[in-house]
Every structure is written in C-alpha cells, then in structure tokens.
Amino acid sequence: MWARTAAWVFGLPETLREICYRRDNVKPVDELQKTIGHRFGDMELLLTAMTHSSWANEQAVPVEHNERLEFLGDAVLELCVSEELFRRFPSAREGDLTRMRSRLVSKPSLEGVARELRLDMSLRLGKGEESQGGRERGSLLSDALEAMLGAVFLDAGYIAAKGVVMRILGPHFPEALVPVRTKDYKSQLQELTQKLFRDRPVYTLLGSSGPEHDKQFDVRVVLPDGTVFEATGPSMKRAEQMAAARAVATLDK
C-alpha cells in the first residue's frame, strides 16, 4: 500500500511504480512457484532471478538483475547435486562422481530443464534482447535457472533449495550415468523389453524448438506394454538416450 500511495503522492515514474508493485509477470511467476514446489516468502528474490540485465538497464531507476543470484545458484546447484550423488552411489569413484555431476549441471542439461519448467515465460527481458530472440536463448535460460536456485536458497535455506533441485533434476539422474556405463541406454532398454515383453521399444520424435544454433529435440519412447517416457535433448540421439535412461531406471527397480 505504501508503494501505491508514494507513487500517487510524489508522482514517481511509472518504472518505479512497477518496481514498487512488482506486478509484472505475476501469472507466469506464480505458475513457476507451483511447478518447482516452492512458495517464496520474499517475492523480490524470485523476480530478481527472472530479471535479465537488459531489462534492468532500460529502467529509469537502478534495478537489480540476476547475475549475482546466478553466481550463488551455480554453487548451490553443484553442492546439492554433489551431495545427492555421494549418497546415491557410495561405491562410485571420484572420477565417476565428477563425470556424473558434470553431465547433470552442464549448460545443455540446465537448458533442457529450464525449457521443461517454461522458464522463458517468467523472464523479464529488455526490448533489444527480446527482439533478438533472447527468450529462446539456451544460455540465458540456464543462467536464469541457476539464479532461481540462488533465490530459493536465500529465501528458505539449503534444505528448501535441495528439495527444488531434486524435484526438477531428480528425473535426470539416471541420464548422468550414460557416459559412465559401458553400454548405452538404448541397447539396455532393448535388451530389457525383449526379455520382459518379447518386443522392442518404439521411439518417436515429437518435435523440436529453438533457433538453429541451439535446437532442442523432444522424443518419446513407448514400451511394448504402453508405458511412455519422454525427454528433451540437444540432439535427437541424445534425447533418445535420455528417454531410454528413464525407462531403464523404472524397469530396473
């Protein structure tokens, strides 16, 4: 209420009113909170995480953007993933743990997760960045994802941040084993389905999105019993491996 009164009485510029209210992008940001399973006590943190420097630079008054939160979120993400891998694979060697972590926190991996979360809908971009297709830029999306994790950490601490990391990255953990195992997941899945169902899985390309230099491919694999697994990756081959990894993780339970 004080912000509305101040803007009306003192004739503050519209940009400052907008900053006071923080009402822009309310619906997408609200949906994002539901998706990640965390309701922010301090909404300012989430809005800052979704604010690109190009948007901040266009405002008439100083506005914080997400680069500092990205720095923090990068460290939070690495710690959360490292701890989870350490606990899940007690017999794994350091080199294997490092390779698995690198796969999970790589830019392509984070870009895919950001697209799954529809993070682009919550971003605040400057006019120039928007016109140049910034909302589809993978590096921008992965940076915003890290900033969001930094915001969760500041808002509610490590346990809350770890919970969000596991909700959004947990399904991708089986995929992290792909470069470590000697056999690829598509081969493993075919062996499993032949053994269990006497038939092969069927892969389908659902579509692709993003600019030519940064395309993402959506793939579905259907098992003989009708069970469906989907994944998104930087190539059709990689997406198929990711979908197969999810299927193998389920069948191996």
Curated annotation (Swiss-Prot):
Entry annotation: catalytic residues: D74, E146
Keyword line: Cytoplasm, Endonuclease, Hydrolase, Magnesium, Metal-binding, mRNA processing, Nuclease, RNA-binding, rRNA processing, rRNA-binding, tRNA processing
Record-annotated DRBM domain positions: 184-253
Xref: InterPro entries: dsRBD_dom, RNase_III, RNase_III_dom, RNase_III_sf
GO MF: double-stranded RNA binding; metal ion binding; ribonuclease III activity; rRNA binding
Gene Ontology cellular component list: cytoplasm
Essential cofactor(s): Mg(2+)
GO biological process, one term: tRNA processing
SUPFAM superfamilies registered for this protein in UniProt: dsRNA-binding domain-like, RNase III domain-like
Family per similarity comment: Belongs to the ribonuclease III family.
HAMAP family: RNase_III
Quaternary state and interactors: Homodimer.
Function: Digests double-stranded RNA. Involved in the processing of primary rRNA transcript to yield the immediate precursors to the large and small rRNAs (23S and 16S). Processes some mRNAs, and tRNAs when they are encoded in the rRNA operon. Processes pre-crRNA and tracrRNA of type II CRISPR loci if present in the organism.
Name by which UniProt lists this protein: Ribonuclease 3
Origin species: Nitratidesulfovibrio vulgaris (strain ATCC 29579 / DSM 644 / CCUG 34227 / NCIMB 8303 / VKM B-1760 / Hildenborough) (Desulfovibrio vulgaris)
